Amino acid sequence: MKIYAFDVDDTLEVSGGPISIVSVGRLKPQGHIVGLNGNWAVVVQTVPLWHRIFSFVGPMEMSKDTFLNQLKTYIPADDYIMVGNIKGVSGASDDEGAANLAGWRFIKESDFAAGAR
């Protein structure tokens, strides 16, 4: 089982990114845990039945890397994957940096949209 944490802005289609909610939704039936590590309010306000796709939303009152550390500490998995932006290259947030600080594997949003898992 893998845990996927998705940034929202410039990552998911609901906020200007290339990744469809449908493609994210395909991960859960494969046995993976899927959640948000970004502007989660956009998703819960625009995606009907968002709670059937996403098992966690955050970060709340903490940095992205701290949130990832909390998830990794308490939820055992075979792989931990942050999907999002490279600051200054594909978006404004440093999701790659947060993933590196937390010891998570990183997938750039356009690579995920192209099929990288």
Give the ranges of each region predicted by the language model.
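Alpha-helical substrate-recognition element adjacent to the catalytic core
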Residues: 2-63
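Residues at the starts of beta-strands that form the adenosine-phosphate
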Residues: 32-33, 79, 105
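Short beta-strand/turn micro-motifs composed of small residues
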Residues: 36-38, 83-84, 110
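Short, acidic/turn-prone active-site loops that include or flank metal/cofactor-
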Residues: 59-65, 111-114
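Conserved Lys-Pro-Asp/Glu-containing loop-to-beta segment of HAD-superfamily phosphomonoesterases
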Residues: 64-92
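Acidic, divalent-metal-coordinating active-site segment for phosphoryl/phosphodiester hydrolysis
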Residues: 86-104
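Short glycine/proline-centered loop/turn elements that form peptide/ligand docking sites
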Residues: 92-95, 110-117
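Short, basic interhelical loop/turn and adjoining N-cap
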Residues: 103-111
